[in-house]
C-alpha cells in the first residue's frame, strides 16, 4: 500500500477520534434496509438538531474508538454502520434515532457512548426518553416556582376572606 493511501486512512482515523472526543453523545446504528430517501430524511432531522451522521468503515471506527479508550465495541462496529455525533444537546442523537427507529423498523440502534462512557442499548433508549435541555430546564423552573405560586395563592385567599369579613 502506498504511503499516500496510508496517510489518508490515518487522517480519517484521526478525524473520527477527534469526533469521539468532542461529542457529548454518540449513537451507532445499523441502517441496512433504509431507502436513500429515508436516510436523507434522517440526516436532515439530525442536522437540524446539530447532530452529524456519518457512514464510516468499521475498521476506522474500531481504531478510532480504541484510540479514544472505548474498548469492547467490536461487536457494535459490524455490518453497515452509521454513527451520529451529538453536539450541545446530549439527548438529540438518541432521541431522534429512537423516534426514527419506531417509524422505520429497518433502523437498528446498536449502542453508543454518553459523555465519554460506553452505553448499552438500554441506556441509549433511556436517554432517548429524556426531553432536551430546554425541556428539562422548564421542568426544573416549574418545580421551583410551584411553592412560591402556592404561597401567593394562599396569601391572596386570606386577604380576600378578610376583605369579605370586613365588609
From Swiss-Prot:
Gene Ontology CC: large ribosomal subunit
GO biological process: translation
Presence of keyword rRNA-binding: yes
Keyword Transport tagged: no
Domain of life: Bacteria
GO molecular function (one): structural constituent of ribosome
Keyword field: Ribonucleoprotein, Ribosomal protein, RNA-binding, rRNA-binding
Subunit structure: Part of the ribosomal stalk of the 50S ribosomal subunit. The N-terminus interacts with L11 and the large rRNA to form the base of the stalk. The C-terminus forms an elongated spine to which L12 dimers bind in a sequential fashion forming a multimeric L10(L12)X complex.
Functional description taken from the UniProt entry: Forms part of the ribosomal stalk, playing a central role in the interaction of the ribosome with GTP-bound translation factors.
Family label: Belongs to the universal ribosomal protein uL10 family.
HAMAP family tied to this protein: Ribosomal_uL10
Name of the featured protein: Large ribosomal subunit protein uL10
Upper classification of the organism: Bacteria, Bacillati, Bacillota, Bacilli, Lactobacillales
Name of the encoding gene: rplJ
Amino acid at each position: 500500500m502506498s504511503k499516500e493511501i496510508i496517510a489518508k486512512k490515518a487522517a480519517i482515523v484521526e478525524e473520527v477520534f477527534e469526533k469521539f472526543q468532542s461529542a457529548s453523545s454518540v449513537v451507532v446504528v445499523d441502517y441496512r434496509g433504509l431507502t436513500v430517501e429515508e436516510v436523507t430524511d434522517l440526516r436532515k432531522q439530525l442536522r437540524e438538531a446539530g447532530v452529524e451522521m456519518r457512514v464510516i468503515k468499521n475498521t476506522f471506527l474500531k481504531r478510532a474508538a480504541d484510540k479514544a479508550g472505548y474498548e469492547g465495541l467490536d461487536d457494535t462496529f459490524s455490518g453497515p454502520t452509521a454513527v451520529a455525533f451529538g453536539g450541545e444537546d446530549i439527548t438529540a442523537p438518541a432521541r431522534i434515532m429512537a423516534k426514527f427507529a419506531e417509524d422505520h423498523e429497518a433502523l437498528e440502534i446498536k449502542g453508543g457512548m454518553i459523555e465519554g462512557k460506553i452505553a448499552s442499548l438500554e441506556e441509549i433508549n433511556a436517554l432517548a426518553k429524556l426531553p432536551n435541555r430546554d425541556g428539562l430546564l422548564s421542568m426544573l423552573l416549574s418545580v421551583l416556582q410551584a411553592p412560591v405560586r402556592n404561597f401567593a395563592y394562599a396569601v391572596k385567599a386570606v386577604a380576600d376572606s378578610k376583605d369579605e369579613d370586613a365588609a
